């Protein structure tokens, strides 16, 4: 029986993970559920999955949950950073699903890595913000990190087994790999007139044509910043150079990514757009379990198409690739700026096209500094958020 902690239990990845657990009750148990403020959802999850611990990041939410949970469930309710670190590093825990969205997921995810846990990485911001430090800690502790994002999971599955065992410090060239082809649907605005983009609403941006996701990642998909963050994540996970990474627009979201080999072969991973597939793969690796996802029906798929990315339409993608080439300081700044600008857009404070403007301004104006520790990273994150918030208020 594999004991799991779900970071971000009330989010979409958390829900998909718990669905896979429910389909395989003889193999997995829930040690702890972690969420931010959603007490109602956490109540329902506690009653269904009976974890040993329920942790709320928000202190008031923890108090409310404690008052509402039946004592007969015998679930310990906790809050606070030190308590969260104790949960992910507990000897009772085998696997940590790292699915807290944004920079908030960095500290607990890194704590799990340092503790040598099996970490299922859905929080791409951890690598975007702390890439080199993250990989160094992973190598030092011997933690097994498996990529949950559908694209990175697809790449992982298309790699030779020896390369899979060297995530973070593999040699793609030695393995005969010429390119990693990172696919993306292009989101809901792929064919919208460029002149209409400033008028796009949060509701329109969140209406992804293929995937069901949270609001923040949906907006990132509309701007293709999500693909940009995945580009940065792929650089660290697969130790890839800029020459080895390519982004391919694939509107149908059937091919989740590809690996191109020196001999001309291209290996792709295909499947229905359902996050339970990569989650189940990571949970059971190197075995296979039932994910609950319907098999792909090739007769219904029809045509598969591919396009080069249009950087005029998707300036956030260009910013992310450029930041990746600049280095760790730039990607940390970009991530912080993007979280502020997307939140402002979702609150109807700025236009959709202002997201890229805020991000670009922060990249050019926030002073870059050496990042030698997690404290340095968090300090730059706070500094950038302050600058981005001030800039948002000027728009």
Swiss-Prot record:
UniProt binding sites for 1-deoxy-D-xylulose 5-phosphate: 124, 150-151, 185, 208, 221, 226-227, 230
Function: Catalyzes the NADPH-dependent rearrangement and reduction of 1-deoxy-D-xylulose-5-phosphate (DXP) to 2-C-methyl-D-erythritol 4-phosphate (MEP).
Superkingdom of origin organism: Bacteria
Binding of Mn(2+), residues: 149, 151, 230
Entry annotated with the keyword Metal-binding: yes
Keywords: Isoprene biosynthesis, Manganese, Metal-binding, NADP, Oxidoreductase
Name this polypeptide is given: 1-deoxy-D-xylulose 5-phosphate reductoisomerase
Metal-binding listed as a keyword: yes
Biological process terms in GO annotation: isopentenyl diphosphate biosynthetic process, methylerythritol 4-phosphate pathway involved in terpenoid biosynthetic process
Single Gene Ontology MF annotation: NADPH binding
Disulfide bonds: none
Record-stated family: Belongs to the DXR family.
The EC number(s) this enzyme carries: 1.1.1.267
Pfam families: DXP_redisom_C, DXP_reductoisom, DXPR_C
Protein encoded by which gene: dxr
Residue runs in coiled coils: none
Organism annotation: Shewanella woodyi (strain ATCC 51908 / MS32)
UniProt cofactor(s): Mg(2+); Mn(2+)
Catalysed conversion reaction: 2-C-methyl-D-erythritol 4-phosphate + NADP(+) = 1-deoxy-D-xylulose 5-phosphate + NADPH + H(+)
Positions with a binding annotation for NADPH: 10-13, 38, 123, 125, 214
Pathway: Isoprenoid biosynthesis; isopentenyl diphosphate biosynthesis via DXP pathway; isopentenyl diphosphate from 1-deoxy-D-xylulose 5-phosphate: step 1/6
């Amino acid at each position: 029986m594999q004991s799991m902690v779900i970071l971000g239990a009330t989010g979409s990845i958390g829900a998909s993970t718990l669905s896979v657990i429910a389909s395989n009750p003889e193999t997995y148990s829930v040690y702890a559920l972690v969420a931010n403020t959603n007490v109602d959802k956490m109540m329902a999850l506690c009653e269904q999955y009976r974890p040993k611990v329920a942790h709320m990041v928000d202190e008031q939410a923890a108090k409310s949950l404690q008052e509402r949970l039946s004592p007969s469930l015998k679930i310990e309710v906790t809050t606070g950073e030190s308590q969260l670190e104790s949960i992910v590093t507990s000897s009772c825990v085998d696997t940590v699903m790292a699915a807290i969205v944004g920079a908030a997921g960095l500290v607990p995810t890194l704590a799990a890595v340092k503790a040598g846990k099996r970490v299922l990485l859905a929080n791409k911001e951890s690598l975007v913000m702390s890439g080199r430090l993250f990989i160094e800690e992973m190598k030092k502790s011997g933690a097994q990190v498996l990529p949950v994002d559908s694209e990175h999971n697809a790449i992982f599955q298309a790699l030779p087994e020896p390369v899979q065992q060297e995530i973070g410090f593999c040699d793609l060239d030695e393995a005969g790999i010429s390119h990693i082809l990172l696919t993306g649907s292009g989101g809901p605005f792929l064919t919208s007139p460029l002149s209409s983009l400033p008028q796009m609403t949060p509701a329109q941006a969140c209406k992804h044509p293929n995937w069901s996701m949270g609001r923040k990642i949906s907006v990132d998909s509309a701007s293709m910043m999500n693909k940009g963050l995945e580009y940065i994540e792929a650089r660290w996970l697969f130790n890839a150079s800029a020459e080895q990474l390519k982004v391919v627009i694939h509107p149908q979201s059937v091919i989740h990514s590809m690996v191109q080999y020196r001999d001309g072969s291209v290996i792709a991973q295909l499947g229905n757009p359902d996050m339970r597939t990569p989650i189940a793969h990571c949970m059971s690796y190197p075995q296979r379990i039932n994910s609950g996802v319907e098999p792909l029906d090739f007769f219904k798929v029809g045509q598969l198409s591919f396009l080069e990315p249009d950087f005029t339409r998707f300036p956030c993608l260009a910013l992310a690739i450029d930041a990746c080439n600049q280095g760790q300081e730039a990607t940390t700044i970009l991530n912080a700026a993007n979280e502020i600008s997307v939140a402002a857009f979702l609150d109807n404070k700025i236009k959709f096209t202002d997201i890229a403007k805020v991000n670009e301004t922060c990249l050019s104006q926030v002073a870059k500094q050496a990042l030698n520790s997690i404290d340095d990273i968090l300090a730059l994150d706070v500094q950038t958020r302050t600058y981005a918030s001030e800039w948002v208020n000027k728009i």
